[in-house]
Amino acid sequence: MGVLYHGSSVSGLKKLEPRKSTHGTYVYATKYEELAVLFMRKCGDDLTYTLYRDNQDGPWKLIERVPNAFETMYSNESSLYTVPDTTFKDIHTGFSELVSTSEVETLSEKRISNVYDKIKELESSSKVELYKFPNRPNVIPNDDTDLVVSQVKQSERTHKKLTKSSFKRLLFLHPNALESINKELSKIGKKPFDINDIVDIFEEFLVRQMLDPSREQFIESSYLMISKNYPSLEPVIKSKLDILNSSQNEKISFILDTIYKRFKDFPKEKFDDIKNYYLNSNKSYEDICKEINNQVVRISMMESLISKDIPSDVLSNSIVFIGPMGSLKSSTSSVMSSILNMPKVSLDDRETLKEYYDKRSEFESFKDFEFYLTSSVLTSLKIPAIIDFGAGHSVYEDPIMFYEFQKLISRFSNVVYMIPSLDKEESIQILNERLLERNSNESTESFDANRHFINMSCNEEVSTIREVTSRKDIQEICDEIISKIQNKEYKNLYIEEEQHKI
């Protein structure tokens, strides 16, 4: 039986369990003690260091790609474990690592109080060659263009679309690669970065660091890199850093103002309400940051969901039905599907949409799940369809969530708001009567929910067509909707209906 090495920040482990990583769910180990130590970093990635060796018998070359990266990455304690090699195999990860799909018993543990000091010991014994910034082997270009090439290749390898955002962190840590990055952006038809963008990107990553201190962003390294390559930016970057020494409310204002820049068309008054809520909160700074960070994570999730490409004919020719319970959405959408010979998709159909509903437990709140369901279904459409929303799928109390939903649904040309009457109280009465006809034991919760759906303005704001359904049969409703779509009457529909109401 041979022995392998594994590094972990956790001490006292009697067995190592497989963990999901880049290559799959494995326990990782290596034949080389020095390599296990080099993997003990607490943070950092390919943008902060490079690791390789020229041949199997040569020393590992560890290159610091940004100032002070080694101190940041390795200023931690860790444990070096030995494990038997019996269940491990080589899947060619790119390093001299072996993997095991099953849990592994540990044979021994050696606690290392400072990983960086241990690496220096390995350097003195010629097992590792350290290159402190800006020193580097000749094979690594001084302008860091190799990192730009790696970013492009990674996008190709993972089949992820290359966007301007793909290069943000690269530019944040390696502003000297600006010209090379812009060359790649020109290839994909994107507007180039300028030096002012570097300031905005620095601000963005500074806020990330403030919101979640446990995730190291290498702020100090970025500051030094920007100052070195663009001395004219040093004063403004320094002023951003100074916010770390300001008062709690000043830091919170800075965080929120920076986040708001991402949402230029978000209603200013609603943003001010959110800002005032946090500025007047009795919660600790740490709790406020945690709460805001959770919102940012949710926003990132929503942005990722709604940014997917949707075929233009789907956006132009699909018909989306929204409205409260009992508004005849399901009946009308079924008949419309038959008339137009278009597939119908119901967001309440748990069986057909099982792959989405099975993920319900992954979301903290039901509204988070509803947003995921709605956006996933809409962005997965390949051909025009009739989409039947559930009553709550288009109503969001959270202003940011509604803002994101609005950005998605506004891409669709035909969004039909089904409503019994232009008078809200009359609508509520008719809707509840319909619910009772459907189920005489209908709970008051449904009635209360309908009142909420009617009083919220969400459906009115996102719809392009408003169809009043009282005293009309389904065929008549369908004919009216088709006529409005064909004649584009819906552009002035709200004005005409309000005049008719008067």
Regions found by a protein language model. Give the residues of each.
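P-loop (Walker A) phosphate-binding loop of NTP-binding proteins
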Residues: 324
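Conserved NAD+-utilizing ADP-ribose enzyme module
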Residues: 23, 42-212, 216, 222-226, ...
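ADP-ribose/NAD+-binding catalytic cleft of ART/PARP-like enzymes
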Residues: 1-24, 39-42
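Glycine-rich phosphate-binding loop used to anchor ATP phosphates in small-molecule kinases
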Residues: 365-409
